[in-house]
Amino acid sequence: MELEPAAHVIEGMRATLFHNPTAGHKATKDDILAAMKLADFDVRYISVKDANLEEAFEKKADLLVIAGGDGTIAEVLTRLPDRAMPVALLPLGTANNIARSLGIAGTPQELVETWKIDNTHPLDVGTVKASWGTSRFLEGFGVGVFAEFLKAADKGEKAKGADNLRKGRALLEKQVKGAKPIELSIKIDGKTFNGEFLGVEVMNVPFTGPGLPLATRAHVADGLLDVVCFDAARRRDFEQWLEAPQDAQAPVTARQGKIIELVWADTANRLDDESYGNRDKKQVAEIACEKDKLKVLIPVKHPSQKAVAK
């Protein structure tokens, strides 16, 4: 991952903090504000539960900070009008797929101490054009089993932390076991693939769902999307992989491309962490990355931190 040269955060820098107060359980609003004020930020706090984001974006700031899970991060960044503004992530969710894909992990205090305003990495924004209009995403767009999994997860009681990841993977395994194969037409840069699948995910980052590395070749800023297909014939292999996804590559078929077209019917679709039902009606969607990329701050080690010798 190539980064721009580091520079110190400016004392008194104006930062707009978008916070989801219901995300996570280890860092409160006061914890985050204290960490940022300790680093000499002039902070304007906004709760994503109460705010009009468009109005909030109009306020001048030098840095935009998002504290929350993948849903909050995607909600704010896909609507950000000025992608030249640097953004910083404080991951407070369960999977934290977007932050994880950028190598960002830690408590708010640990992360704030490592921010350098010019140490950024670009992040693609995906776009979907379909009958409902145009939508943007950061993590992925898909149809079939993952979308049905999200619908089922919304109905269940939410656990916290690693326990939630474990329960999420168990629920996905249950969905995979009962998933009805669907006929899909997939076009990648003009080449068509037709088949019977449990689902397909068009991914912008390596991780999705309950912290699963499905698109290990994905690069967050190459303008390419990874098309991950769940072959009906490999259902049992995928069920077994979900029990220990850290031990092996996912048993999926993955291809890359710039312009993806999906044609499907009678199954749900998902956009990041939101799922939408679709029964009977044929849908056609074109998926690609937008030209303008986001600028995300990447943590840098403090000079006093030494690598541990092996």
Q: Where is each model-derived feature located?
A:
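Catalytic core of DAGKc-family lipid kinases
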Residues: 15-17, 30, 35-39, 44-46, ...
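Short acidic/glycine-rich loop or secondary-structure boundary segments that cap or lie
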Residues: 146-149, 194-196, 207-211, 235-238
